[in-house]
Amino acid sequence: MLQIPFGWYVVDYSDELKVGDVKAVRYFAQDQVLFRTESGEVSMLDAYCPHLGAHLGHGGIVSGECIECPFHAWRWKTDGKIGEIPYAKNIPPRAKETKIFTYPTVERNNLIYAWYHPHGDEPHYEVETYPEITDPEWGDDFEKFEYRIKCHIQDMAENAVDAAHFMYVHGVASYPEFEVTYEDQKRFFYQKADMITPKGTVKGKISGASNGPGDNFTRFE
């Protein structure tokens, strides 16, 4: 079994998946196709057409509310079920019974999240909303940074709660005072983190929330 904890994970930025866009992506050690229909709905399916195995993300196009296979133009709906076979008067019963695996998706915080569970369970919780991201007073021209790091996701989580290294690695003035609380899958932390700068020590605070393994937000004051 793939050693990835279940939860919501960011798979794209909302503004980078326009109406009609089709992307070949790979998450959770699987190939997927991510697309936005003509009505604006986002869907992420397993990548391969059940008909003859063509990759829907390479040459596939959006047709209305479906993604059209590049091989025989079979059209698959956002729920993974067959929508249309253009050259067939009737859809064969076997095709009607076929369903491409669909990842639950949600758009929030100007991001596209997909739900992963190793056994295909439906989402156990909701994605959080972080008001600063869509608040006009904070602006809408956010910088985006992406890093590819070769480590297990558990290493990232453990680093976040390792307050002892802050003073030696990040320049915190002293060992930070911190508090951690839990609520179901959510983890909240608050800590004082005075920073040493060329102009002297600056008092600071860091607070954050982890809503499962792939939905995290940190505030610096």
Could you tell me what each predicted segment is?
Residues 8, 102, 144-146:
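Well-ordered beta-strand positions in beta-sheet-rich domains
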Residues 1-7:
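Hydrophobic, proline/glycine-rich low-complexity stretches
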Residues 41, 120-221:
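C-terminal catalytic domain of Rieske-type non-heme iron oxygenases
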